Regions:
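Flexible, processing/modification-adjacent segments and terminal tails
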Residues: 1-42, 138-153
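Gly/Pro-enriched, hydrophobic low-complexity segments
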Residues: 1, 40-137
C-alpha cells in the first residue's frame, strides 16, 4: 500500500462476476477469454494506483473496488506510454447466509488476465474450495500484536 499513490476517481457501476455459482470458472468466445457465468451490475469505487518506484513494470492501474465485498473484480493496467496493456478479471464465490462466520467472506475462484500487447490470455482456476483458517480472538491478538510483528528488529 505504501509503495503506491492512491487516488479516488469516482463511483461507477460495472458488470462483473461477483458470485460464481459453478464449481470452477468456465470461459468461452474467441480465444476463450470471456467468463461464462452470470454477470451482475456492481457498485464500485474507481481508484487509480501509481507506483512510487520508477522501475515498476507498469505506469498505473485502475482498480474497481466492489462497494459491498471490497473485492476487486476488474483491474486495468497501463504501460509506461499510458496505453491499456492488461485487463484482469477476478472471480469470487459468495457463501450462503447459513454458513459459519469463518466461511462468510467471498472466496477467490479464479482470474482471467488478457494481455492486449501479446494478444493472449491467462486463465487461472481454483480446483478446490478456498480454506478459511479458524482462530479464536485470543490467538489473533497474540499472532498480530504489534510487539510480535516488530520482534527481532
Amino acid at each position: 500500500v505504501l509503495d503506491y499513490t492512491w487516488t479516488f476517481i469516482e463511483s461507477r457501476k460495472i458488470l462483473a462476476v461477483s458470485n460464481m455459482e459453478k464449481e470452477m470458472i468456465t470461459v468461452y468466445g474467441p480465444n476463450s477469454r470471456a467468463l461464462q457465468h452470470k454477470y451482475q451490475l456492481r457498485d464500485c469505487y474507481v481508484t487509480e494506483v501509481k507506483s512510487i518506484w520508477d522501475g515498476h513494470p507498469y505506469k498505473r492501474r485502475i482498480l474497481f473496488i466492489d462497494k459491498e465485498t471490497f473485492n476487486i473484480p476488474v483491474s486495468l493496467i497501463f504501460d509506461h506510454n499510458d496505453k491499456l496493456w492488461k485487463v484482469m478479471q477476478t472471480v469470487t464465490s459468495s457463501p450462503s447466509s447459513a454458513t459459519k462466520i469463518e466461511n462468510s467472506v467471498p472466496s477467490w475462484r479464479g482470474q482471467i488476465t488478457v494481455d492486449l500487447k501479446a494478444n493472449n490470455a491467462t486463465v487461472v482456476r481454483a480446483k478446490t474450495p478456498t480454506l478459511h483458517p479458524v482462530m479464536k480472538p485470543k490467538e489473533i491478538k497474540r499472532v498480530f500484536a504489534v510487539s510480535t510483528l516488530t520482534e527481532g528488529r
